[in-house]
């Protein structure tokens, strides 16, 4: 399956990506929580994705999100926050609870909340700087459109097991792509991503 090698590549990039030397300070454990969330998404698989091939869909992940270098730091933090918020909203629903192992789902949602809290602090730091909030509107709208498409897909497929599996794999892809955005943010108390 072509998706697995790209996920593994993204995870390796995520593990090795140097955290930038910019002004947003994230706690040192932020990257560890992010890695754990990625692993939890992998563990949540309940059915073989091979039986869901007919349900595959290109959700059109915003390609400019895959390369975090084109965003100023305030935008990177804002876009990452929006992505994590949308992922949390997707998995923190009654329909999602019915589809997944609730223990893994609860761990994932707790980890996402921790990351969101870290980014809230980061965004508060950035608000005092010159970057205007208007500069973050276009990228965050692209993220919202992307997730709206995922929600519509689930609804069209009547929240079937295969639809949830396809969405889980897509979220893993978008989550691993967010590593580039996280790479723009400096880790407090040392860079875990530095070689």
Swiss-Prot record:
Disulphide bridges: 24-122, 52-162
Organism of provenance: Equus caballus
Main location: secreted
Keywords (A to Z) from UniProt: Antiviral defense, Cytokine, Disulfide bond, Glycoprotein, Secreted, Signal
Full protein name: Interferon omega-2
Record has Protein biosynthesis as a keyword: no
Residues of the signal peptide: 1-23
Glycosylation sites: 101
Matches recorded under Pfam families: Interferon (PF00143)
Cellular location(s): Secreted
Biological-process GO terms, alphabetical: adaptive immune response; B cell activation involved in immune response; defense response to virus; humoral immune response; natural killer cell activation involved in immune response; response to exogenous dsRNA; T cell activation involved in immune response; type I interferon-mediated signaling pathway
